[in-house]
Amino acid sequence: MDGMLTEGTSAIPPPQPPLEPIERPPTPPPLPPDESALPPPPTDPAPPPPPPDSLAPPPPPEDVPRSTYTVPVVVKKKKVGWGSSKSTTPLSVEELLRKKKEADEAASRPKFLTKSQREKLALEKRAKEIEHERRIRAASTNGSMMSDSNGGGGNSNGRASPTTRYDNVNGSSRTSIPTAPRALRGEIPTAPAAMRSSQAKNNDPRPGNKVPSDSAATGEKRTAPEDAQALLTRQRYMGADQTSSFSAKKKRRRTTERKFNFEWNADEDTSPDYNPLYQNRSEMNFFGRGRLAGFSDDVVDSAAKRYAKALEDRDLEAGSARAREILEMERRRREEGGRNGLDLHWSQKRLDQMRERDWRIFKEDFNISTKGGSIPNPMRSWGESGLPKRLLEIIDKVGYKDPSPIQRAAIPIALQNRDLIGVAVTGSGKTAAFLLPLLVYIAELPRLDEFEWRKSDGPYAIILAPTRELAQQIENEARKFCNPLGFNVVSIVGGHSLEEQSFSLRNGAEIIIATPGRLVDCIERRILVLSQCCYVIMDEADRMIDLGFEEPVNKILDALPVSNEKPDTEEAEDARAMSQHLGGKDRYRQTMMYTATMPSAVERIARKYLRRPAIVTIGNIGEAVDTVEQRVEFISGEDKRKKRLADILASGEFRPPIIVFVNIKRNCDAVARDIKQMGYSSVTLHGSKTQEQREAALASVRNGNTDVLVATDLAGRGIDVPDVSLVVNFNMATNIESYTHRIGRTGRAGKSGVAITFLGNEDADVMYDLKQMLMKSSISRVPEELRKHEAAQSKPTKAGGGQKRLDEGGMSAPKTGSGW
């Protein structure tokens, strides 16, 4: 054999195709197997495994002629080591790059095969698959025959023992009990039967080459029930597998397979050129943005003219008439603003062009929010208010140019005889908002001087105010409108004698402005009756409750006649039903309430005496106006605060008048004396002053004779001092509502103002609310001391079951009933 494997083997001719495999001597036949347990025998005998490379090929058999026997060609491996020489010349880089480039080009170029070549490759591939399956089948047959010949797990008589039957769970024994579905019973064993039994007994699997099964050979993936259950459990708790199964080589159905293709191209269509009307008609709609593609009116007009000319050229008779109609429509469209004015601002539209969207934008611009049923839209100007012409002339003469937000929303509602709750910040024009509808209401009633008995039946309307100063201020404002109309207005407040006020009522009065306490005294002394009162207005209702006037207010409202009371039904929201006269003369009573905050006591009064009220809110409840800049300084001690006040007044930044607020009466005179020592004139205003002293102090400040007004919370509500540039809280208010009304004395009527507050540790109860108010203001800043203070981090809890602390003066009202 060594001579056959010498270096002369290169001269041997190429090998010929192999002949039939060599027949081996026959082996004794095994026991007849169970045909139902064994796979079918192969049709062709399986060839023996090839010999390893290290062994020499076997000699030719004696019974085969030498001429037909072909010696397999074996290429001798070159020996490396002793007596061999290794090539030391490496390949150059250029040659490697050239070879790589050629290989890439060859791989990138498509290889075209003929039909015969493709069929040949397919046949070769199929032959390899068949050969592979045949080898697998032969290996499984040989393994089962070897296990039977060795008597694996059987008795001497060839039968399997009972123990072996139940031990061979994997199906290696042909007599074992089936433990799997029929489709999985024929899996190929992984080892001989003797080894399987020993492995199962010792529970020690031995490593080895696993023979692939039929399912693996055919490419099918079978999943055991246990594996499927484990997969579902893993997906349930760990989520679905994120690995994508997308394959670019996967054959997909083309979406254009069933698409019908015409024999002619779309570019060959000449029909648009036939009619000139469709050439450039709609090309503008696809460019730009806006009302009509963002083009100006000139472009739109030119397009309309071009379209009209095309119509005339097409048809001289009917086309000319149609062209004139189109030009007329375009002219009307330009006059109306296009698409009924959708592209115009609400201030440029007519009233009939206003839509729901425009009214919503209008309310957002003025920060108006309404609540209730059947509420009319607000008015945009005095001309759209619906007021009588005579009253509009007086408004123009007084100098009211544009209505304020509360006037825009409240006047149209009040003109429909609806009960109203107006929630607005201080200095927003609430006085005119309830005076003008009141004058329209009483103008339709009989005059008091028509009959003598009407004068003794009392007024048509009463206006309640919490303080004397506010009542007199409302009286002065009402006289501007009532005197030209011939109505009589009388104020009934404390500080004046009852005889003087009784003399003022001798000729009757259509409108009475009073404080709750003095009005109750007049009713109890039979000086005044409310037999024909049909209009009630409560201004600063929350302030009246804070001053302890809840019980007097209830007495006044209970003294009103019940014959003209509104029903608590949906009719109270019907403007036409509420405008009717009862019995031909009387009208339904109308009640209005204006407030800056809504405490529970005010809600109780509103629930008891108002019928289906419309609620109008301007801004946010309890917030200061945006025209006031709030500044907070931490200063403890009276001396330091007085020194800081002197620096503020001496800075020259603020022009008089200036208001300084303190908490207690005795501090007013002390602070006023210190201000006079600084070189500024000052007056005081508090509850211990007489009515004449109060009026004189306010008059001196309004006339410009006094620079600084030092006051308690008495001046914090409703007192209108024009052009106040600065408010100084020498002592912080005891609650945030009083603070809101204090700083509301400045920044009124749209003007700007500044409020400076001196804060100390004794004001811990209001620090949280003060911090929240400063954060909501767009022009104010929260100081670091207040931001980091412990009391400003959470809202304090009220002691005593939430009882609200009242301001100075007044009597406490019993808190009965539930909130509204």
UniProtKB/Swiss-Prot annotation:
This is Pre-mRNA-splicing ATP-dependent RNA helicase PRP28. The keyword Hydrolase applies. Residues 116-136 have a biased composition (Basic and acidic residues). Residues 159-178 have a biased composition (Polar residues). The gene is PRP28. A motif (Q motif) lies at residues 380-408. InterPro entries: DEAD/DEAH_box_helicase_dom, Helicase_ATP-bd, Helicase_C-like, P-loop_NTPase, RNA-helicase_DEAD-box_CS, RNA_helicase_DEAD_Q_motif. Residues 1-70, 101-255, 784-820 are annotated as: Disordered. The Q motif is unique to and characteristic of the DEAD box family of RNA helicases and controls ATP binding and hydrolysis.
